[in-house]
Amino acid sequence: MARIAGIDLPKNKRIEIALTYIYGIGRPTAQKILEQANIDGNTKSDDLTENQINSIRHVIDSHYKVEGDLRTEVSMNIKRLMDLGCYRGLRHRRGLPVRGQRTHTNARTRKGPRRSVMGKRKKA
């Protein structure tokens, strides 16, 4: 089992798909990585040689920010917005949608489950 960027890649999948198990690598990025490493995307991940695995590791380490580094950068960006006190930062702080969606109705994913209010009942 190949281990790249601290993630065990699944054995039975094509390497193009297996690379997407790494946080920060999607299908297009996986294709670019394999192109730079001169590896066919249809190769199963357990059929890779040690040389090929090392070349993939080298490409990822030198060109891409993945896993812990990327998670840290994203959380630091959000923290920076919150510290600035800008509109987006306030929305993050309050747990509301950040990108202009309506909140009068909907936005339940971001706001969480409904809180019931006493006295708001249909009259019989």
From Swiss-Prot:
Ranges where the record places region Disordered: 95-124
A Pfam family the protein falls into: Ribosomal_S13
UniProt-recorded Gene Ontology molecular function terms: rRNA binding; structural constituent of ribosome; tRNA binding
PANTHER family the record matches: 30S RIBOSOMAL PROTEIN S13/40S RIBOSOMAL PROTEIN S18, SMALL RIBOSOMAL SUBUNIT PROTEIN US13M
Family according to the record: Belongs to the universal ribosomal protein uS13 family.
Superkingdom of origin: Bacteria
Cell membrane is among the record's keywords: no
Described purpose of this protein according to its UniProt entry: Located at the top of the head of the 30S subunit, it contacts several helices of the 16S rRNA. In the 70S ribosome it contacts the 23S rRNA (bridge B1a) and protein L5 of the 50S subunit (bridge B1b), connecting the 2 subunits; these bridges are implicated in subunit movement. Contacts the tRNAs in the A and P-sites.
Name of the protein: Small ribosomal subunit protein uS13
Subunit annotation: Part of the 30S ribosomal subunit. Forms a loose heterodimer with protein S19. Forms two bridges to the 50S subunit in the 70S ribosome.
Keywords: Ribonucleoprotein, Ribosomal protein, RNA-binding, rRNA-binding, tRNA-binding
One GO cellular component term noted in the UniProt record for this chain: small ribosomal subunit
GO terms (BP aspect): translation
SUPFAM superfamilies: S13-like H2TH domain (SSF46946)
